[in-house]
């Protein structure tokens, strides 16, 4: 069972909020879920630093994939643009 999961990399879809660094973008990934106790829909977001080889711009929707550590904070890379 564990062998099926091994080697699979996580992917997330988010919006580029900053592209001011060289070959690095900040991607905001939103998560919507129902609160277990209060049954209210909660919107939560996380920011990920991702390696940018595709030259995506601020405002683009992108798919990012987990990768080996590229720097102190970068552990994701941009795979493609999502329309």
Swiss-Prot record:
Family annotation (Pfam families): Ribosomal_S17
Swiss-Prot/TrEMBL keywords: Ribonucleoprotein, Ribosomal protein, RNA-binding, rRNA-binding
GO cellular component terms attached to this protein's record: cytosolic small ribosomal subunit
Domain of life assignment: Bacteria
One GO term of the biological process aspect: translation
GO function term, MF aspect, one: structural constituent of ribosome
Family to which this protein belongs: Belongs to the universal ribosomal protein uS17 family.
Record note on quaternary structure: Part of the 30S ribosomal subunit.
Its job: One of the primary rRNA binding proteins, it binds specifically to the 5'-end of 16S ribosomal RNA.
Protein name, per record: Small ribosomal subunit protein uS17
Highest classification ranks of the organism: Bacteria, Pseudomonadati, Chlamydiota, Chlamydiia, Chlamydiales
Gene name as annotated: rpsQ
């Amino acid at each position: 069972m564990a062998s099926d999961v091994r080697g699979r990399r996580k992917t997330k879809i988010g919006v580029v909020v900053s592209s001011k660094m060289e070959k690095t973008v900040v991607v905001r990934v939103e998560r919507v879920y129902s609160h277990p106790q209060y049954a209210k829909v909660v919107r939560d977001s996380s920011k990920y630093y991702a390696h940018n080889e595709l030259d995506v711009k601020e405002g683009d929707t992108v798919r990012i994939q987990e990768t080996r550590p590229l720097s102190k904070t970068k552990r994701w890379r941009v795979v493609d643009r999502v329309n």
